[in-house]
């Protein structure tokens, strides 16, 4: 008990059972094994086995996933590519008597073990290190319920980094606490939906422009609220933005502008675009546990619902779904599929690889170019200027959304986020950073 740190009573109960053998401990170190033998205890032996060891501990926990105690993948890449990663055990075939004793050891036949295959990923350890540092800083600064960040190449969907808090060391999986294990091992980026708030306005803008229902020269008037179906819906700026053009509406994130955009398109046209962006179904990312966004049935949508959807309310999306769909807005209008696997190899032979063939066109290249210009203004002089870095071309949109509990708005609880894109030679990355329930007064996405 002293060697392994186990409770005396439960260990005594385990070894007192009437059975031929009992496993007392697994993954025993050489130091622990030496202490056992030095104690002179009789009837104790060990067997060697192979198991997963993660040299970087809690690095990439959610995306890598973990294995069961017998080596089978349970979550993340470990589960999704288990059929490739798991090898075949070796065997010795011999003739035995009725009680299982070998009759002729010389006539045994050995079947050698077959090693598992190698899965090459799109993950970048350098970018992952930066992201994990940023997540730790956000945890220390905002004391939130959770933090998540994903970085993806918006030109082809290759995921470069994914990090979430809370997390755990993959070498010390909390198997004894199933609630903790479930909450800390699942990827919220893949499996959890949330109300995106103003980051959703990227899609509304692109759809409105591409449909021809809105032009960049159109002017709008924001009085601080808009009445739809007899209900007053407020802009975040209580005094209103006044008379502004479309570009100023995007730059200042005016809710009234995006309500009008959605209403001009109408439910069917707007929903057709959202479907084309891929938001109404799973992205197809090669990780376990993915879910799809939640939308009101288009046949049940009222104008007041449509207006709210326009600025990111009355809708729920997954982070991976939002990043994938907005990537189409930035990359020239082509739909991408998020993925982590680059290729599967056996020695030098490629068994499987991810096809980078072009996806469906969602919006025109002209609309995409216009959106890039507008979103650069958001970062340069608008609501996202906190993300501005001199010498770099950065596009983006902030988001602050209220949370709901039991169907009601949870007062004082917010999800703050920033959705940004870098535009440079060889580094076309989209980044979605989410802070769940930041504490204190700094809860707006523009501050977080």
Language-model regions: role of each:
Residues 82, 86-89, 108, 120, ...:
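Amphipathic, well-packed alpha-helical segments that form the structural scaffold of globular domains
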Residues 21, 103-147:
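Conserved, well-ordered alpha-helix/loop/beta-strand core segments that scaffold catalytic motifs
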Residues 57-59, 143-145, 388:
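Short, basic and Ser/Thr-rich N-terminal targeting/leader segments
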Residues 97-108, 149, 153-198, 203-437:
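Beta-lactam-recognizing serine transpeptidase/beta-lactamase-like catalytic domain environment
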Residues 435-448:
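A short acidic/glycine-rich loop-to-helix N-cap element
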Residues 42-44, 140-154:
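Short N-terminal helix-loop-first-beta-strand/juxtamembrane motif that initiates sensory/input modules
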Residues 1-116, 433:
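Small/polar-residue-rich segments within soluble enzyme cores
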Residues 20, 32, 171, 258-260, ...:
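Extracytoplasmic/secreted cell-surface and envelope-processing proteins
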